[in-house]
Amino acid sequence: MSSKSYSAGVKDYRDTYWEPDYQVKDSDFLACFKVVPQAGVPREEAAAAVAAESSTGTWTTVWTDLLTDLDYYKGRAYKIEDVPGDDEAFYAFIAYPIDLFEESSVVNVFTSLVGNVFGFKAVRSLRLEDVRIPLAYVMTCNGPPHGIQVERDKMDKYGRGLLGCTIKPKLGLSAKNYGRAVYECLRGGLDFTKDDENVNSQPFMRWRDRFLFVQEATEKAQQETGERKGHYLNVTAPSPEEMYERAEFAKEIGAPIIMHDFLTGGFCANTGLARWCRKNGMLLHIHRAMHAVMDRNPRHGIHFRVLAKALRLSGGDHLHTGTVVGKLEGDRAATEGWIDLLRERFIPEDRARGIFFDQDWGAMPGVFAVASGGIHVWHMPALVSIFGDDAVFQFGGGTLGHPWGNAAGAAANRVALEACVKARNEGRNLEREGKEILQAAAQHSPELKIAMETWKEIKFEFETVDKLDTTHR
């Protein structure tokens, strides 16, 4: 029988979960939340409430607290900061002991950090801005099935970014016509083509038919060009059993890479598929469909940098990241920050890029950043400058929309990429001299010349909704 006294009733969260003098441990999970409390709720109380509800707390004192070491297991709100430009919101920094989380389980981490607390009445809005995953926990996770260097070795592609294309129209093509589009793109010079996120197994194109026609197209393009090619076969399915059936069939027919929608498919399915890919030598492309539901509102949800970290833990060799210059939302500094979080081994805190904590990935492989969404040849200099070589540049409409057809669109993109890489390696400034570099290359490539004429007026100049806090620039 414990000698501790037990006092029933309700007490302020800050009495237990607010510890401004707490010394953060290397083994702690750290989280930064942007909090907008309800009127009349003090900042310390709101921060402590978030710490409690995302760890050991509930709305009242319970006698079973005496049966464990609550002081060891609880989350602690240890720091509060103002949010520049927002008088209502503040940043709450919370530390969680590593033993609160099951090893190698992104599912359990997110169930704890964001599973219940986002509906808490004490806060008007809540956003998870960043997390620090301790190295001790990173080492329990398998991470990407292969990573950047292994993929380059498998595909025999070095010294430049990879080129891809999403087949369009994304829905409605027959399997035979879909395969034809794949073949034209790959023979024209692309490294990969891909299924779009919502291509699964619809009445107009069942998955098995698509896989067979696409693999035939891929192998034919390989034989003609002498280059290794691939198509991201989307194995996302109604159930895990069907997902693995599709993955096994892709392996049987010789496909080098498959694809998964990791947010709609779920972290459990994604982690299992990543482990299967590692065991079976398959590359894994990850689409982020549904991400903007969670990450676009600057006051509520989960920032994409957190989702990117979660994917690296769960496993994937590619991840869509936005483009900065294309049709999708993306602040440049923030995008460069999460590109590094996907690829580098150690990323220091850098508020100018929205990174709130140091992140050490140890020996975990990196992930190719995928730039996709409304891009064309005129964007190539900026893309190479922003993303570097360890990226996949995917031109859907920017390939299939070429007036001369898919193969010509692919050739235009290949010439533009190689011209930009060559110019960069010679020391030229791509963002300042990009127009001249492309115009010079177009003198020897009629496909590129026509592409430049076709899309010379196409821009996506809209104000970014989710901006970095301006005083951290």
UniProtKB/Swiss-Prot annotation:
It is an enzyme of class 4 (lyase). The keyword Nucleus does not apply. It catalyses: 2 (2R)-3-phosphoglycerate + 2 H(+) = D-ribulose 1,5-bisphosphate + CO2 + H2O; D-ribulose 1,5-bisphosphate + O2 = 2-phosphoglycolate + (2R)-3-phosphoglycerate + 2 H(+). Mg(2+) binds at K194, D196, E197. GO terms for biological process: reductive pentose-phosphate cycle. The modification N6-carboxylysine is found at K194. Binds 1 Mg(2+) ion per subunit. The record marks K327 as: Transition state stabilizer. The keyword Metal-binding applies. Keywords: Calvin cycle, Carbon dioxide fixation, Lyase, Magnesium, Metal-binding, Monooxygenase, Oxidoreductase. Substrate binds at N116, T166, K170, R288, H320, S372. The active site is at K168 (proton acceptor), H287 (proton acceptor). PROSITE patterns: RUBISCO_LARGE (PS00157). Its EC number is 4.1.1.39. One of its GO terms (molecular function) is monooxygenase activity. Its cofactor is Mg(2+). RuBisCO catalyzes two reactions: the carboxylation of D-ribulose 1,5-bisphosphate, the primary event in carbon dioxide fixation, as well as the oxidative fragmentation of the pentose substrate. Both reactions occur simultaneously and in competition at the same active site. PANTHER family: RIBULOSE BISPHOSPHATE CARBOXYLASE (PTHR42704), RIBULOSE BISPHOSPHATE CARBOXYLASE LARGE CHAIN (PTHR42704:SF17). Belongs to the RuBisCO large chain family. Type I subfamily. The basic functional RuBisCO is composed of a large chain homodimer in a 'head-to-tail' conformation. In form I RuBisCO this homodimer is arranged in a barrel-like tetramer with the small subunits forming a tetrameric 'cap' on each end of the 'barrel'. HAMAP family: RuBisCO_L_type1. Heterohexadecamer of 8 large chains and 8 small chains. This is Ribulose bisphosphate carboxylase large chain. It comes from Alkalilimnicola ehrlichii (strain ATCC BAA-1101 / DSM 17681 / MLHE-1). The gene is cbbL.
